[in-house]
């Protein structure tokens, strides 16, 4: 009788080993680095890293930045539509060595995520961190702290690898500049030839999709006889150019309505719309994005919030499987104490989870672990 015997990995060809490893989730692969020199060499190869990101089954971790801390969350939405209360548990806290305040926690005003990398920025610090591999890259900046900065992280998409870059908006009230930081050369350069025909509000959070960054921007235009001043625009890190203005799936004004942008697993975009003097909230999702152009939208959710109203600055992510969305914002109570509140919303369902202490200025996002090197 014939028996099947397992073959040791050492007798497999390198191509076959690479093909097997390219299908293993990133969080599992990092634990294999020290087990075999051949595997470690493969895992450090930029060509393999790109292949792995394109091939392996993605892991999605819900993250929360609050009170200078970054924590992973366990969000259970099953049963939301059957009147079963959902649950949220703050799990492992991620600490980045060196990026510490006096309390020993991660200090950051904003976090931007792209392909498993987290970009932390405040008035004095720029650091990129891959929590999966533990790698960090501290970036020097000579810009004065008095200038207003806005950052985005993306990559130049080449055939064999991806070259990562940071885009920085600098505005001191009189002068406006764009700068690019290239990871390969560890240097900044000014983008003199790029024209800006919009205003980027301080509260507009950029979102990364397939290496490019998208924002909701302000630019007064007349559409069908009505004044509309909110559009979607993008920055292509390969061409280093802004894309055309794309109309949102609703007519709105940045100055009065609540609008917030999010990414759906870094593959598509979603946008929240809460019209002034209305208790109805809508979330729309892009159907397709080709060459940085959003071609169409679908309405994902429409909910009557009854007495609640969101404010600009709210962050959120959606759960397509459970037809739900999770939001976070700071809310004062009757004693003017600030609480960080998480809202879980489904079709005709609203659940509230109070994280109690604050203020946090919480920022929610979905993180995709990767082997990307910095």
From Swiss-Prot:
Ranges for domain F-box: 6-52
CDD domains, per the entry: F-box_AtFBW1-like
Pfam families: F-box, FBA_1
Coiled coil: none
Gene3D superfamilies: 1.20.1280.50
Alphabetized SUPFAM superfamilies for the sequence: F-box domain (SSF81383)
Membrane spanning stretches: none
Top-level taxonomic group: Eukaryota
NCBIfam families, per database record: F_box_assoc_1 (TIGR01640)
Record-given protein name: Putative F-box protein At3g17480
Lineage, highest ranks first: Eukaryota, Viridiplantae, Streptophyta, Embryophyta, Tracheophyta
């Amino acid at each position: 009788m014939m028996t099947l015997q397992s073959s040791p990995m050492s007798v497999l060809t390198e191509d076959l080993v690479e093909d097997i490893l390219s299908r293993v989730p990133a969080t599992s692969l990092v634990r294999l680095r020290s087990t075999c020199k051949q595997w470690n060499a493969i895992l450090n190869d930029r060509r393999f890293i790109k292949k792995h990101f394109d091939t392996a089954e993605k892991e999605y971790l819900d993250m929360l930045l609050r009170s200078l801390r970054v924590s992973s969350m366990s969000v259970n939405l099953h049963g939301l539509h059957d009147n079963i209360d959902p649950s949220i548990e703050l799990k492992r806290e991620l600490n980045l060595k060196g990026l510490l305040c006096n309390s020993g926690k991660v200090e950051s005003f904003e976090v931007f995520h792209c392909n498993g990398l987290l970009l932390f920025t405040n008035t004095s610090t720029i650091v990129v961190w891959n929590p999966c591999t533990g790698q960090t890259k501290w970036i020097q900046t000579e810009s004065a702290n008095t200038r207003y900065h806005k950052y985005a992280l993306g990559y130049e998409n080449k055939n064999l690898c991806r070259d990562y870059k940071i885009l920085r908006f600098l505005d001191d009230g009189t002068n406006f500049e764009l700068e690019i930081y290239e990871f390969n050369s560890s240097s900044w350069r000014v983008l003199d030839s790029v024209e800006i025909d919009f205003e980027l509000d301080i509260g507009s959070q950029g979102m990364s999709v397939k290496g490019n960054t998208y924002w909701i921007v302000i630019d007064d235009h007349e559409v069908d006889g009505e004044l509309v001043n909110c559009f979607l625009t993008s920055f292509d890190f390969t061409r280093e150019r802004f894309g055309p203005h794309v109309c949102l799936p609703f007519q709105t004004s940045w100055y009065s309505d609540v609008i917030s942008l999010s990414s759906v697993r870094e593959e598509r975009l979603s946008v929240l719309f809460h019209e002034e003097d209305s208790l109805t909230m809508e979330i729309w999702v892009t159907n397709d994005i080709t060459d940085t152009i959003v071609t169409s939208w679908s309405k994902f959710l429409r909910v009557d919030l009854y007495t609640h109203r969101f404010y600009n600055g709210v962050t959120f992510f959606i759960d397509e499987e459970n037809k739900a969305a999770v939001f976070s914002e700071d809310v004062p109570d009757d004693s003017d104490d600030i609480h960080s509140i998480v809202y879980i919303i489904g079709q005709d369902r609203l659940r509230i989870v109070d994280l109690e202490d604050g203020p946090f200025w919480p920022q929610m996002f979905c993180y995709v672990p990767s082997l990307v090197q910095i």
